[in-house]
Amino acid sequence: MQGRLSAWLVKHELVHRSLGFDYRGIETLQIKSEDWYSIAVILYAYGYNYLRSQCAYDAAPGGLLASVYHLTRIQYGIDQPEEVCIKVFVPRTNTRIPSVFWIWKSADFQERESYDMLGISYENHPRLKRILMPESWIGWPLRKDYIAPNFYEIQDAH
């Protein structure tokens, strides 16, 4: 079943894949990494002016990594704002996804956390560096194939 936003994207010949709806009825779309930035700009212009959250996950050991964006279209006089979930999948060998920091400033720390925990590299992010782990930490702790070190030293926060 195709949702309203998916139908609009098809009408304007924008490449995507509909993944259906979640349990709350929110449409979920898959966008290719190379198309993500231009579609994000279009979604912002279309009225999706609020990035509610961005997160990432490891789909399977040795498999794809996903960056997930929950966007909301907030308008005055509307009781129920429209929401959409966008998923961008990348292989472990090329984890580059365009940053949407310049569209939605709230992506700043969220993209940094996804980088820190899963190693997804957000291109053109102004401060893409570790946010939770020390800079010297080796590896990406939330990847399913991550092997935790036998010993690590707890350091004071900076």
Curated annotation (Swiss-Prot):
Where does the signal peptide begin and end? none
Q: Which PROSITE patterns match?
A: COMPLEX1_30K
Entry GO MF terms: NADH dehydrogenase (ubiquinone) activity; quinone binding
This enzyme catalyses: a plastoquinone + NADH + (n+1) H(+)(in) = a plastoquinol + NAD(+) + n H(+)(out); a plastoquinone + NADPH + (n+1) H(+)(in) = a plastoquinol + NADP(+) + n H(+)(out)
- Mind listing the UniProt keywords for this protein, alphabetically? Chloroplast, Membrane, NAD, NADP, Plastid, Plastoquinone, Quinone, Thylakoid, Translocase, Transport
* EC number annotated for this UniProt entry: 7.1.1.-
Q: What class of enzyme is it?
A: translocase
User: According to its UniProt record, what is one Pfam family this protein matches?
Assistant: Complex1_30kDa
Q: Some GO term, biological process aspect, for this entry: which one?
A: photosynthesis, light reaction
Its main subcellular localisation, reduced to a broad class, is: plastid
Q: How does it sit in the membrane?
A: Peripheral membrane protein
InterPro entries in alphabetical order: NADH_DH_suC, NADH_quin_OxRdtase_su_C/D-like, NADH_UbQ_OxRdtase_30kDa_su, NADH_UbQ_OxRdtase_CS
Task performed by this protein: NDH shuttles electrons from NAD(P)H:plastoquinone, via FMN and iron-sulfur (Fe-S) centers, to quinones in the photosynthetic chain and possibly in a chloroplast respiratory chain. The immediate electron acceptor for the enzyme in this species is believed to be plastoquinone. Couples the redox reaction to proton translocation, and thus conserves the redox energy in a proton gradient.
What is its quaternary makeup?
NDH is composed of at least 16 different subunits, 5 of which are encoded in the nucleus.
UniProt xrefs under HAMAP family: NDH1_NuoC
Please give the PANTHER family that the UniProt record associates with this protein.
NADH DEHYDROGENASE [UBIQUINONE] IRON-SULFUR PROTEIN 3, MITOCHONDRIAL (PTHR10884:SF14), NADH DEHYDROGENASE UBIQUINONE IRON-SULFUR PROTEIN 3 (PTHR10884)
What's the protein name?
NAD(P)H-quinone oxidoreductase subunit J, chloroplastic
The organism is Piper cenocladum (Ant piper)
**Name of the coding gene:** ndhJ
